[in-house]
């Protein structure tokens, strides 16, 4: 097993579940039905197979997540990713922070904001500016 990553990063780390994912061939009808709410049309990944161990939660979680991250109106996609980074930092979820930081940097074509947030925290000017934009965007929708 690889050593756990202990610092925030914009590079998406390898993810390995700590529980054994569901074997698709052994999935119940309820689990198969729950996996239909996922957005992938290519394959069902290990993450979804882990979530499918609790099909009721998966059926609720996926539409909620998709509504927050991809819904029409509200914050821009980059602002949504920045908000997801903030939530991931508060929750100390290094993997989720990396996924959302990477996507934010792709959307904005600017890695300096995430580098600044992860290196210097919210006190750095570039991080303060991004956080201020996010706060203003949230206030405009409140």
Ranges and model annotations:
Residues 1-142:
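Hydrophobic alpha-helical segments
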């Amino acid at each position: 097993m690889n050593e756990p990553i202990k610092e925030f990063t914009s590079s998406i780390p390898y993810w390995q579940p700590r529980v054994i994912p569901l074997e698709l061939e052994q999935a119940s009808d309820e689990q198969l039905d729950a996996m239909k709410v996922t957005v992938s049309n290519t394959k069902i990944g290990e993450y979804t197979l882990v979530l499918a161990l609790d099909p009721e939660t998966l059926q609720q979680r996926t539409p909620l997540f998709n509504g927050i991250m991809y819904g029409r109106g509200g914050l821009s996609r980059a602002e949504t990713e920045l908000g997801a980074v903030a939530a991931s930092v508060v929750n100390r979820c290094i993997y989720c922070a990396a996924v959302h930081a990477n996507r934010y940097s792709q959307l904005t074509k600017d890695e300096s904001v995430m580098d600044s947030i992860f290196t210097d925290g919210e006190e750095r000017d570039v991080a303060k500016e991004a956080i201020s934009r996010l706060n203003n965007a949230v206030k405009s929708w409140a």
